[in-house]
C-alpha cells in the first residue's frame, strides 16, 4: 500500500554480516588501539521491477555459491549484464579506536570510514578496462585514486568519580562525497572508469538497506518510510551532521541522558534538493 504498487521491491532475500577486529596494546598499559573491518551483504532475492505493463521478476542466485560470494565477495547478479559487479548489495566500514585509561577517566577517539564498493573501500579503483567483444576486460595497469572525505569522527570520555556527568560524546559525520558525482564505465568514447555516485544505502538491483521502511544502520539516513512519493529508497544520503550526548547519575535514584543532533542534507546525486534541508533533533 505504501508504494502504491509502483515501486521496485525484493522478496526472499538474505542478509550476511561479518566483522573482524585487532587490538594492539598491553593489559597493564593505559593506551591501546582497536581496528577492524565490518561488512554486510543482501543477496539471493527475487527482484521485482515495475514497468507500465506490470512487474517483471528477476530471480537472483540462491545457492551455495551465492553464500560463498556473500562471505568473500565476488560473483555477479542476474541483472548485471556486461558490466558485472559483486553479487548482492554489499557495504561495510573500516573502524579504528584509540583508548586511554586513567584512574579518574577513560578517553576515546574513533573513526568509521564507510563504503559501498571498492572505490571507497580502498580509495582506489582499477582504471584499465576496455570494452571488447561485448564485455569489460582488463587491458592496462591503471588505477584511479580517490580522496578520503566520507567519514565519521568521534570522541568520548567516561568520568569515573564525577556523578553529575559520567559520560560525554561528540561525533561528526560527512557523507557528501561518495567517491564523486560521476559514475561511468570505460568505453571507446570515454577513456576512464570513474566509480562515483556510490549512493549510500541504495542499490540499483535492490530496494536498499531498510526493513519495513526503517533504515538498517545509521538513523541519519532518512528512512524510506518517511517518503511521500511511495519509493522504497533513500532520498537523502548526502549530508553533514554533528551529534553530542551527555549522561550522569547525580543520585542513586536519578539518572539522565541528553542527546542532540544537527544535520544538513543535500538529497542524493540523482535527485538533489533545490536547497539544503536542515534538521535538529533533541532527546
Outline where the language-model segments fall.
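Signature for the C-terminal beta-barrel architecture of outer-membrane proteins
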Residues: 1-184, 242-244, 262-275
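C-terminal structural cap/anchor segments
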Residues: 177-273
Amino acid at each position: 500500500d505504501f508504494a502504491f504498487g509502483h515501486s521496485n521491491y525484493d522478496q526472499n532475500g538474505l542478509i550476511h554480516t561479518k566483522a573482524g577486529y585487532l587490538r594492539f596494546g598491553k593489559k597493564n598499559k593505559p593506551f591501546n588501539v582497536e581496528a577492524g573491518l565490518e561488512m554486510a551483504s543482501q543477496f539471493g532475492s527475487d527482484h521485482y521491477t515495475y514497468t507500465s505493463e506490470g512487474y517483471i521478476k528477476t530471480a537472483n542466485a540462491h545457492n551455495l555459491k551465492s553464500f560463498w560470494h556473500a562471505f568473500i565477495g565476488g560473483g555477479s547478479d542476474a541483472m548485471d549484464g556486461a558490466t558485472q559487479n559483486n553479487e548482492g548489495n554489499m557495504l561495510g566500514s573500516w573502524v579504528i579506536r584509540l583508548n586511554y585509561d586513567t584512574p579518574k577517566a577513560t578517553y576515546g577517539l574513533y573513526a568509521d570510514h564507510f563504503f559501498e564498493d571498492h572505490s571507497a573501500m580502498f580509495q582506489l579503483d582499477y582504471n584499465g578496462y576496455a570494452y571488447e567483444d561485448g564485455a569489460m576486460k582488463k587491458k592496462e595497469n591503471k588505477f584511479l585514486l580517490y580522496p578520503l572525505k566520507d567519514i565519521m569522527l568521534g570522541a568520548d570520555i567516561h568520568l569515573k568519580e564525577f556523578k553529575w556527568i559520567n559520560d560525554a560524546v561528540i561525533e561528526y559525520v560527512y557523507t557528501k562525497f561518495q567517491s564523486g558525482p560521476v559514475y561511468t564505465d570505460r568505453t571507446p568514447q570515454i577513456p576512464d572508469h570513474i566509480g562515483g555516485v556510490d549512493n549510500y544505502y541504495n542499490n540499483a538491483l535492490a530496494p536498499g538497506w531498510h526493513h519495513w521502511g526503517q533504515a538498517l544502520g545509521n538513523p541519519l539516513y532518512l528512512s524510506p518510510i518517511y517518503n511521500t512519493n511511495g519509493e522504497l529508497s533513500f532520498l537523502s544520503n548526502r549530508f553533514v551532521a554533528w551529534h553530542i550526548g551527555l549522561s550522569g547519575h547525580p543520585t542513586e535514584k536519578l539518572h539522565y541522558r541528553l542527546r542532540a543532533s544537527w544535520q544538513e542534507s543535500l538529497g542524493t546525486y540523482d535527485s538533489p534538493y533545490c536547497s539544503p534541508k536542515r534538521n535538529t533533533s533533541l532527546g
